[in-house]
Design a protein with these regions (language model features):
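Gly/Pro/Ser/Thr-rich low-complexity, intrinsically disordered segments predominantly at protein N-termini
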Residues: 1-208
Length: 208
């Protein structure tokens, strides 16, 4: 008799959501994080030993991401580097904890994607440029925690796109030090330092 095992779709969804949120905020080792997220459809980040559950992005976030991908992809077409967008895991060294950080940038540019892949076709390299689009739930993490993650992890350039204030903050790193930074308020043209010639209008980024 199977009556005791019958559950509604809503009950199953509630249990899955509860399990997903149960891990958020937990401090675990990198190995434990890999075990938790293996074959797990929920999206997580792992920063400084702590697990972060990634919520589904909103409409505006995805519109601006699509705009950025189109602008970046058009510029990088025919060049040796490629543009990727989330969901796309990036694992970076965390020397302070002698461990690793695992993040999902909204958009990234990789110049080592051909050689830095494991047997499961997972990316193992270091992006040259990373873009994060702020949302209400990620403002603090993207502007503080991820800034340090990318700086210490070997990323060369980090763009923070702020739809609320219609601005883009650009950070340029060299030898794991902040080399330069700039702020572009709409309307403006964001000019990459690491990729000379890559110029993106904020009007095009925030177009709806």
């Amino acid at each position: 008799k199977l009556d005791a095992c019958e559950e509604s779709a809503d009950d199953l969804m509630l249990k899955e959501d509860s399990a997903a949120y149960a891990w958020s905020g937990k401090r675990v080792s990198y190995e434990e994080f890999c075990e938790i997220t293996e074959n797990n459809e929920d999206r997580y980040e792992y920063i400084d030993g702590e697990i972060y559950l990634l919520a589904a992005p909103g409409v505006s976030h995805q519109m601006f991401l699509a705009n950025l991908y189109t602008l970046f992809n058009n510029w990088f077409m025919g060049k040796p580097c490629r543009v990727f967008f989330s969901p796309f895991d990036v694992t970076l060294a965390n020397d302070a904890l002698k461990s690793k950080n695992v993040v999902e940038p909204d958009l990234l540019v990789s110049c080592d994607y051909l050689t830095q892949r494991n047997e499961n076709d997972r990316y193992t390299g270091i992006p040259a440029l990373v873009v994060e689009i702020l949302s209400p739930g990620t403002r603090g993490k993207d502007q503080l925690k991820k800034l340090n993650v990318y700086l210490n992890g070997g990323v060369r350039e980090y763009w923070i796109v702020d739809p609320r204030d219609r601005k883009v903050m650009l950070y340029y790193f060299a030898d794991q030090q902040l080399e330069d930074m700039d702020l572009f308020r709409d309307p403006a043209v964001v000019k990459s330092i690491h990729f000379p010639g890559l110029e993106v209008s904020t009007t095009d980024i925030f177009a709806d």
